[in-house]
Amino acid sequence: MTALGARKVQVPGNLKYAAAPLPASDTDLHDLARMIGDRPVWAAVSTHQGEEEIVAAAHTDLVQKIPDVLTIIVPRHPIRGEDITNRLQSTGHITARRAAGQAIDSDTGLYIVDTVGELGLIYRLAKVAFIGGSLVPHGGQNLLEAAKLDCAIVHGPSMTNFTAIVAEMRHAAAIEEILDSKELASAIATLLRNDDLRSRRLKAAAQVAMKKDSILDNVIAELAPFLDSAAPRADVSAPPARCHAQS
């Protein structure tokens, strides 16, 4: 903006901090929680092509440590759900697919949530989340959403879309970076089994996510004087408009 001639430029911060926690249907939350039962749950959210196989490999390793673990996969593009399911089934995984109305049972290892608008539901059920788009060269996805719903965060090395947020989270010891399926499985297993560590991470991430939640108010306060001066003024000398009844 300064290069374009602006004399005074302010950067209030990322407006994603101001977003409310993602919503979830109480009915869906109850129904899905009933299907899951007391199984330990983690989720790989907003995954991109190439990441589902990494997540599935991590799940295979996890089962050796936590036999009843349930892995939820939420692809960034739900249209890929059927293809993801077919590919994972072809390698021997037992799956259930939400868009197809398939229920979770005791044999289900991978639950594919290929629907729109249910990320808030999944964050409320999972204890740990891997943030997708970070084990492929995409730049990551929004990790504040997980932080605001008490979900411990693990991510890959590609988080360039959220550099500042990641730096703050890392400084607060709120997140963990992994490089491959082995490290992913190890991180998830540790967080699922270590309540104290997970609680510390959750608290640290929530503090980072919430300390700037007034950022939108600050932006509006800065813009208000300009909006007031730019607003058209009514001509008080003009007669009021008449309303004509229609028959």
Each model region followed by its residue ranges:
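Nucleotide-activated sugar donor-binding and catalytic core shared by glycosyltransferases
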Residues: 1-247
